[in-house]
């Protein structure tokens, strides 16, 4: 990761605190050339970061329903806010000091760097003007994403951050990158972009 004096956990907290301070004045009229492949590259890094646990895992009878209505936004600005929130939570989760020992730290840091850079790009899409009341997306959307990731955090904590628990959470992270791709593709359809997106078929 880029060298700095802040721990990944502290930086992730700062990122999560930053979002409410953003205005909802959306200024990104065009997605960048590399945006089309962001989710695909992230899935590749996630797969390389998290190999299967050393021991077989029992079947996990637990689900984390994602608020699918957030993927059907008709507003480009709101789609960007949702994407930003998902990525901030993913950064926070994957920078945990409790990730399994068999995960590949160097690749995980590459993944965190990629997420961090894209978060920074999305933050630049918001212009700092307007009152505090204009600086938040819909409260229900904010709460539903928080609830989703809080349930994942509670699951990890309840199971003492075991390797098998993290493997189940890895699948949730994989789904989140696919949700991010859905949002990016929707935003791409509202703006010219020459890069063609690769299919997200990583298992």
Swiss-Prot record:
SMART domains in the record: IFabd
MF-aspect GO terms: cytokine activity; type I interferon receptor binding
Disulfides per UniProt: 28-125, 57-164
Pfam (any one): Interferon
Cellular component GO terms held in the UniProt record: extracellular space
InterPro entries, A to Z: 4_helix_cytokine-like_core, Interferon_alpha/beta/delta
Glycoprotein is among the record's keywords: yes
Subcellular location as annotated: Secreted
GO biological process: adaptive immune response; antiviral innate immune response; B cell activation involved in immune response; humoral immune response; natural killer cell activation involved in immune response; nitric oxide production involved in inflammatory response; positive regulation of toll-like receptor 3 signaling pathway; response to exogenous dsRNA
Cleaved signal peptide residues: 1-27
UniProt keyword annotations, A-Z: Antiviral defense, Cytokine, Disulfide bond, Glycoprotein, Secreted, Signal
Recorded superkingdom: Eukaryota
Annotated glycan sites: 37, 160
KW Zinc-finger (keyword) present: no
Main location: secreted
Function: Has antiviral activities.
Family: Belongs to the alpha/beta interferon family.
PANTHER family assigned to the protein according to its UniProt record, in alphabetical order: INTERFERON BETA, TYPE I INTERFERON
Protein name: Interferon type B
Gene designation per UniProt: IFNB
């Amino acid at each position: 990761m880029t060298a700095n004096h802040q721990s990944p956990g502290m930086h992730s907290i700062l990122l999560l605190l930053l979002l409410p301070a953003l205005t909802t004045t959306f200024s990104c009229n065009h997605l960048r050339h590399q945006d089309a492949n962001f989710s695909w590259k992230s899935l590749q890094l996630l797969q390389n970061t998290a190999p299967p646990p050393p021991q077989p895992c029992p079947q996990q009878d637990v689900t984390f329903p994602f608020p699918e209505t957030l993927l059907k936004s008709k507003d480009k600005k709101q789609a960007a806010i949702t994407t930003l929130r998902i990525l901030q939570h993913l950064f926070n989760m994957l920078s945990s000091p409790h990730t399994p020992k068999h995960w590949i730290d160097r690749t995980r840091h590459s993944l965190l760097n990629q997420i961090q850079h894209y978060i920074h790009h999305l933050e630049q899409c918001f212009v700092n003007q307007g009152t505090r009341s204009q600086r938040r997306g819909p409260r229900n959307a904010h709460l539903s994403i928080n609830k989703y990731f809080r349930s994942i955090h509670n699951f990890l904590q309840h199971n003492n951050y075991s390797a098998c628990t993290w493997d189940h959470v890895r699948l949730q992270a994989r789904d989140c990158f696919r949700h991010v791709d859905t949002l990016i593709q929707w935003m791409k359809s509202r703006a010219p972009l020459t890069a063609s997106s690769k299919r997200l078929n990583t298992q």
